[in-house]
């Protein structure tokens, strides 16, 4: 950027704009809208709306956390309720998340905001209408719990910025609850976004698997026939010695990497992908070996039309699949539009 352009952006164009209330998720839409259609198509980049993010994170973990909070609120005895709120806050602070195709960070940012809102509810239970005297350690949840991998260097910067904005905004909400100013230095906290090719990296070097609770995201949408040579090579490096791997869509790589990473852990995963992963050859080529290795589907959103908040929306149909390797006694759920159906088992056709 020339000095003239920088001055135009920072001063003339932004002179009357209040940045304090900007939605961090808007950054994702801005980033995607700067890409030309060919770049977006070849990279399979599609921004995820808040609504679609919650289709992933709500059944993966957020619904359960909300239910637990409501149970704490219902406790009649003040001391017991306060103690449970403290323990709940520590639980939130102990959760760790990975988005291995994080793009501009919308999954991580929205998850951080959702956790901080729950934490603020717990803080309300602890302090009531009192003014906090000791504000040194009120907030436990941090952006350091959120890890991402992204191949595009500019998207990495956008993701870090979005997390910092979210951190600042949620800090203000906490200050309103405790009626006190909290020490906060923006950009001081560390955002764990790693620039690199997630399909060639050892995810354990990004975040140790014994520390991780959840994997989530919206990996690139690139059909088997549309992959470039580099993407094809990446796919074959993930599906070593698999039959008919060349017929799989690019997104299948993240299913395989996640399934491998979850072995011998309690990690749970949920991914958005084109509905091709639950149709035709993918059922035999992807899911049969995954099921044989111990993977099972915990919940699924059947085919829905993709909508995002960016211009030039992706014209695709998607599914969301939650899966894990560890034993899971919870009821399995299939979502169709706004209807939820319980199931004993969910197969690859959903």
Task: List PLM regions with ranges.
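Signature of N6-adenine DNA methyltransferases within the class I
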Residues: 51-52, 109, 116, 156, ...
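AMP-binding/adenylate-forming catalytic domain of the ANL superfamily
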Residues: 186, 193-194
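Short amphipathic alpha-helical surface micro-motifs
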Residues: 10-13, 29, 79-80, 127-131, ...
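Pocket-edge positions in alpha/beta enzyme catalytic cores
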Residues: 44-45, 130, 134, 207, ...
């Amino acid at each position: 950027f020339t000095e003239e352009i920088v001055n135009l952006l920072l001063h003339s164009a932004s002179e009357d704009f209040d940045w304090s209330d900007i939605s961090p998720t808007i950054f994702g839409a801005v980033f995607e809208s700067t890409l030309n259609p060919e770049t977006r198509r070849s990279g399979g980049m599609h921004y995820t709306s808040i609504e679609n993010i919650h289709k992933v994170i709500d059944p993966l973990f957020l619904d359960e956390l909300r239910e637990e909070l409501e149970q704490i609120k219902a406790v009649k005895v003040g001391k017991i309720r306060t103690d449970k709120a403290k323990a709940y806050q520590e639980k939130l602070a102990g959760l760790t998340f990975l988005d291995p195709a994080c793009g501009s960070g919308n999954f991580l940012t929205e998850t951080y905001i959702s956790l901080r809102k729950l934490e603020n509810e717990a803080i309300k239970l602890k302090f009531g209408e009192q003014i906090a005297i000791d504000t040194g350690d009120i907030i436990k949840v941090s952006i350091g719990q959120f890890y991402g991998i992204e191949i595009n260097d500019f998207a990495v910067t956008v993701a870090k910025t979005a997390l910092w904005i979210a951190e600042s905004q949620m800090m203000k909400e906490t200050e309103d609850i405790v009626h006190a100013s909290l020490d906060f230095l923006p950009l001081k906290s560390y955002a764990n976004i790693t620039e690199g090719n997630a399909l060639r990296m050892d995810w354990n070097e990004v975040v140790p698997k014994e520390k991780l609770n959840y994997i989530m995201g919206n990996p690139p949408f690139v059909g088997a026939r549309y992959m470039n040579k580099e993407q094809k090579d990446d796919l074959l490096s993930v599906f070593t010695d698999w039959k008919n791997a060349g017929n799989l869509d690019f997104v299948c790589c993240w299913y395989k990497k996640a399934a491998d990473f979850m072995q011998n852990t309690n990690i749970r995963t949920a991914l958005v992908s084109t509905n091709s992963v639950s149709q035709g050859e993918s059922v035999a080529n992807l899911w049969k070996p995954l099921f044989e290795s111990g993977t099972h589907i915990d919940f699924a959103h059947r085919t829905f039309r993709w909508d995002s908040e960016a211009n030039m929306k992706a014209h695709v149909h998607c599914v969301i699949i939650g899966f894990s390797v560890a034993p899971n006694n919870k009821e399995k759920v299939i979502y169709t539009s706004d209807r939820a159906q319980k199931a004993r088992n969910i197969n690859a056709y959903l």
